[in-house]
Amino acid sequence: MGEEGDFSRQHLLNPTLFALLGPLEGKEILDAGCGYGYLARMLARRGARVTAVEPAESFFGYAAERERTERLGIRYVQADLSTFRDYAVTFDVVIASMVLMDIPDYLPAMQNCTDALRSGGSFIFSLAHPCFEGTEREYHDKGYVEVKEYLAEYCLPQPFGCLFHRPLSHYLNAVIQRGCAIQEIVEPKLDPASASAAPGHERNVHVPSFIVIRAAKLP
């Protein structure tokens, strides 16, 4: 994965996230589930004050080491999003990018994310689109994505563990029930020129792999 993420992050997720974020200078931002820290570093380089939480020791170790070699002022915390609440500040923005569908106990994690926001702050999260979880290979072979058992919750085995399929309504209702108002939903689309230069990503011209939601914490 490159300094600004893999192809999907560079061409689909990052442009969407930064469009939803707007100006970053001076904002307090929590990167919830930061992985190896690429997004936290991008945010800090644009002037945000960043706290980044990651449970996995290998990812956390890499991100913390990068902070020692490139001082951006990022505060890294190794902790579980479902249980950690000890933040020193309230945040203008909490971002959980490609995280919640990897967490078995996702509702406490969403609660902790929204609790960490100041009134009026933004909760932005991205997911593997639960409506269209077919692989690139399936789309290439069939020309469509087949949807099965959409309304159930289950584990989709991955090399890293489970991707937990949940209906989209479960996430949206969880945000609303935690005192937030949904402001914008984006299904990132790949332009044909980028797709032609990156074989294996053609489906994103027609069928979104991701969905990004921005919500605001109500007073």
Spans of model-derived segments:
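A short acidic, Gly/Pro-enriched loop at the edge of an enzyme's catalytic core
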Residues: 84-94
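A short SAM/SAH-binding and catalytic strip from SAM-dependent methyltransferases
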Residues: 93-107
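Short alpha-helix
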Residues: 161-185
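Core SAM-dependent methyltransferase catalytic element
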Residues: 178-180, 198-219
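Conserved class I S-adenosyl-L-methionine
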Residues: 1-25, 38, 42, 62, 123-153
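Class I SAM-dependent methyltransferase SAM/SAH-binding core
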Residues: 30-32, 36-83
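A short glycine-rich, Lys/Arg-flanked "PGG" loop and its adjoining helix->strand segment in the class I
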Residues: 107-122
